[in-house]
From Swiss-Prot:
Protein name: Class I hydrophobin 2
Subcellular location: Secreted; Secreted, Cell wall
Role of this protein: Aerial growth, conidiation, and dispersal of filamentous fungi in the environment rely upon a capability of their secreting small amphipathic proteins called hydrophobins (HPBs) with low sequence identity. Class I can self-assemble into an outermost layer of rodlet bundles on aerial cell surfaces, conferring cellular hydrophobicity that supports fungal growth, development and dispersal; whereas Class II form highly ordered films at water-air interfaces through intermolecular interactions but contribute nothing to the rodlet structure.
Gene: Hah2
Subunit structure and binding partners: Self-assembles to form functional amyloid fibrils called rodlets. Self-assembly into fibrillar rodlets occurs spontaneously at hydrophobic:hydrophilic interfaces and the rodlets further associate laterally to form amphipathic monolayers.
Organism taxonomic ancestry: Eukaryota, Fungi, Dikarya, Basidiomycota, Agaricomycotina
């Protein structure tokens, strides 16, 4: 019985990955150059636990579950992000993970799309 359940999960995630890769594109990729935090004009400044390409297994699974389509597999996405405020009093003020600017932050920090790494200079 366990073998059937694990086979079902494996087929589900394989199908999910195939659907994500075969879906038409919707968002444009962002340049990967590191920019100063003061010039974060591509979106909001975020502190993400993980920053990955959209085609990575964990990012592709989340994008598929949320029904999000991205243009190109080289788009950077941030996973489990918190905002960094200009004043430094937000929940992400002490960013020890990856500070990024992200264009699409509509998923309450679960996943942010179109991210560009930044240099906080702290």
């Amino acid at each position: 019985m366990f073998a059937r359940v694990s086979t079902l999960f494996a087929m589900f995630f394989l199908g999910l990955a195939l659907m994500v890769s075969a879906t038409p594109a919707a968002l444009k990729p962002v340049a990967r150059d590191t920019i100063p935090a003061s010039q974060c004009n591509t979106g909001d400044l975020q502190c993400c636990n993980t920053v990955e390409n959209a085609d990575s297994p964990s990012a592709a699974a989340l994008l598929g579950l949320l029904g999000v389509v991205v243009q190109g597999l080289d788009v950077l996405v941030g996973l489990t992000c918190t905002p960094i405020t200009v004043i430094g009093v937000g929940s992400g003020a002490n960013c020890v993970q990856q500070p990024v600017c992200c264009e699409n932050n509509n998923f309450n920090g679960l996943i942010n799309i179109g991210c560009t790494p930044v240099n906080l200079g702290l």
